[in-house]
């Protein structure tokens, strides 16, 4: 950001404005912002602000950019147009306009005064909307959400690596009750061939009185 600030001239680094020749301009011109003057109302009273910018290579020609509710908005409009028309040679009202203001497309400059004016209005509106937008809870906890997403990706992989490494591998004697695998599965097969006990053999006296559900239900 410091590089961008040093690359552009600003009204704060330039010599003070020369006194305006016409009385009207002396009364309405903004004391600091370049290309901005008040429209309507008495000096010192609230009013709207207009903006115009000098056209490079056309002596005495100015490009009218429109009327704005605040002097700051008009000053931002001046910066957007100056960047489009003059590039690095532009003198800005705000040093951060070089990177905070949406750029005016080159096609707008080629379209003439109307194209530049329309593009500047869009840029100022986008800048004001972005500056006024409050930070939402989703943005406040965005980092926490990202961390959770990272954990979702990392933890299963780590667990898979542990199991793949055989850290929980058991020997056959522990898994099959002291028998080898063949004898263990053979005993299971024999158990499936045994007839279930007679109905009522597994009733608990007194505890399941009145219940029709046999314990041997499979």
Swiss-Prot record:
Source organism (scientific name): Oryza sativa subsp. indica (Rice)
Protein known as: Dehydration-responsive element-binding protein 1B
Signal peptide span: none
Parts forming coiled coils: none
A GO CC term assigned to this protein in UniProt: nucleus
InterPro entries on file: AP2/ERF_dom, AP2/ERF_dom_sf, DNA-bd_dom_sf, DRE1A-I
Cellular localisation: Nucleus
Domain of life of the source: Eukaryota
Keywords: Activator, DNA-binding, Nucleus, Stress response, Transcription, Transcription regulation
DNA-binding residues (ranges): 32-95
Role, per record: Transcriptional activator that binds specifically to the DNA sequence 5'-[AG]CCGAC-3'. Binding to the C-repeat/DRE element mediates high salinity- and dehydration-inducible transcription. Confers resistance to high salt, cold and drought stress.
Pfam family, one: AP2
Gene: DREB1B
């Amino acid at each position: 950001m410091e590089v961008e600030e040093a690359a552009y001239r600003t009204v704060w680094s330039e010599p003070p404005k020369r006194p305006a020749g016409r009385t009207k301009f002396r009364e309405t011109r903004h004391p600091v912002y370049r290309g901005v003057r008040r429209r309507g109302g008495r000096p010192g009273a609230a009013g709207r602000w207009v903006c115009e910018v000098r056209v490079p290579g056309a002596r005495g020609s100015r490009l009218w950019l429109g009327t704005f509710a605040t002097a700051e908005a008009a000053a931002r409009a001046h910066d957007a147009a100056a960047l489009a028309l003059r590039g690095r040679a532009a003198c800005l009202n705000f040093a951060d306009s070089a990177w905070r203001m949406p750029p005016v497309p080159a096609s707008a400059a080629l379209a003439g005064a109307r194209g530049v004016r329309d593009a500047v209005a869009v840029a100022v509106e986008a800048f004001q909307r972005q500056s006024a937008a409050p930070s939402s809870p989703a943005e406040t906890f965005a980092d926490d959400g990202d961390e959770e997403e990272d954990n979702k990706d990392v933890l299963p992989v780590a667990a898979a690596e542990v199991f793949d490494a055989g850290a929980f591998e058991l020997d056959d004697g522990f898994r099959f009750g002291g028998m080898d695998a063949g004898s263990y599965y053979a005993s299971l097969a024999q158990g499936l061939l045994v007839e279930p006990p007679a109905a009522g053999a597994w009733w608990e006296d007194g505890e399941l009185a009145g219940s029709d559900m046999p314990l041997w239900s499979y």
